Amino acid sequence: MRAVAPIGAFATPDNFSAPVGSKLVGAAFEARAQEFLQRQRLRFVARNVACRGGEIDLVMRERDGALVFVEVRARAQRRYGGAAASIGWRKQQRIVRAAQHYLATRSSQLRDQPACRFDVIAFEAGRLVWLRDAFRADEV
């Protein structure tokens, strides 16, 4: 399922060329993605979960208890396939590895193994695009 929203308050072209560096620009887009998902009634769990093999930008929880691991990408233009297309097979593997690490290190806090989903929030060409269930762990 794909949800598209005009960026409007989410971003301006200045965010793509800010002299403060890509880490701060990335953090700003992650914050905007988090705000968007919370308005969609997902609950914030964690941000920038890292392990040796990868990182997850956002961990959210659906109302039904499912954990949603979110990759946030931003591109000023849609050339070369846009932001979502930049998440290739290797990046998907790293995200899945980080999610497995996250679940393993928090198994004592989780009563049962929750259902999990991998989503992408892409900011591209003036729009926010939400790709629910963008890829599956068993496909990478």
From Swiss-Prot:
Lineage: Bacteria, Pseudomonadati, Pseudomonadota, Betaproteobacteria, Burkholderiales
Highest taxon of source: Bacteria
UniProt-recorded name of the protein: UPF0102 protein Bxeno_A0149
Organism of origin: Paraburkholderia xenovorans (strain LB400)
Family as reported in the entry's similarity comment: Belongs to the UPF0102 family.
SUPFAM superfamilies noted in UniProt: Restriction endonuclease-like (SSF52980)
Ranges in a coiled coil: none
GO molecular-function term, one example from the UniProt record: nucleic acid binding
